[in-house]
């Protein structure tokens, strides 16, 4: 049975589970929405949705430095209480997220943050490529949905495959941690710094150097 993007998105809204988890749940349950919710609950992936409405205003700004100080990451993860912010599991989660960001280089936390013009530009590129295949318009739109979801999975932190466990997304990892800790959590923002990024390196004029050496 073919699972549509609309089905996946609807299940995601209801449960708060990751897109890949929602798609798997729908596939395993033959596209039945209610059974898919139960499937996610049995896996502990929908538990976080019950806590999603609670304010998460405490938390921690974590950091990770890699490659001899050439790559650095700051990430803010929020929780509900200062007590949980001091919890070892919470702090380990923050560190793991910072390490993932250093390795995977996401651009945004969630797809809602991606500028509309960037999405439209990507859609236009994918649509033109699909048209060249000569496929019917309906098929092209399905291909387009898949390509855009892949685009989001590449640049959005919550939809990326977790580098330490390729079987789950960061959203799944977050949901599991929420279920384990018992408080709502949110990855608010992050920044990645790469030494020298954006700076133009001065290139020496080899001919001038030779001439100068000869003249000495």
From Swiss-Prot:
Organism: Geobacter sp. (strain M21)
Keywords on record: Cytoplasm, Elongation factor, Protein biosynthesis
GO cellular component terms listed in the entry, alphabetical order: cytoplasm
Function: Associates with the EF-Tu.GDP complex and induces the exchange of GDP to GTP. It remains bound to the aminoacyl-tRNA.EF-Tu.GTP complex up to the GTP hydrolysis stage on the ribosome.
GO MF annotation terms: translation elongation factor activity
Main location: cytoplasm
Pfam families: EF_TS
Parts forming coiled coils: none
Lineage: Bacteria, Pseudomonadati, Thermodesulfobacteriota, Desulfuromonadia, Geobacterales
Family statement: Belongs to the EF-Ts family.
Annotated localization: Cytoplasm
Name of the protein this chain belongs to: Elongation factor Ts
HAMAP family in the record: EF_Ts (MF_00050)
Protein biosynthesis as UniProt keyword: yes
Region (Involved in Mg(2+) ion dislocation from EF-Tu): 81-84
Gene encoding the protein: tsf
């Amino acid at each position: 049975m073919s699972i549509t993007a609309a089905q996946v998105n609807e299940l995601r809204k209801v449960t708060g589970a990751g897109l890949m988890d929602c798609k798997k749940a729908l596939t395993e349950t033959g596209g039945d929405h209610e059974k898919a919710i139960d499937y996610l609950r049995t896996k502990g992936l929908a538990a976080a949705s019950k806590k999603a409405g609670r304010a998460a205003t405490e938390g921690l700004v974590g950091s990770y430095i890699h490659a001899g100080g050439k790559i650095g990451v700051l990430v803010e993860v929020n929780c509900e209480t200062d007590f949980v912010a001091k919890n070892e599991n919470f702090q380990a989660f923050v560190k793991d997220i910072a390490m993932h960001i250093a390795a995977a280089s996401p651009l945004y936390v969630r797809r809602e943050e991606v500028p509309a013009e960037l999405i439209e530009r990507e859609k236009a590129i994918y649509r033109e490529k699909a048209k060249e295949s000569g496929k019917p318009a309906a098929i092209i739109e399905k291909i387009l949905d898949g390509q855009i979801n892949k685009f989001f999975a590449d640049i959005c932190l919550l939809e990326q495959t977790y580098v330490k466990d390729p079987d789950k997304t960061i959203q799944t990892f977050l949901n599991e941690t929420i279920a384990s800790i018992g408080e709502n959590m949110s990855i608010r923002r992050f920044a990645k710094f790469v030494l020298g990024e954006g700076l133009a390196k001065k290139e020496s004029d080899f001919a001038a150097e030779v001439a100068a050496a000869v003249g000495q």
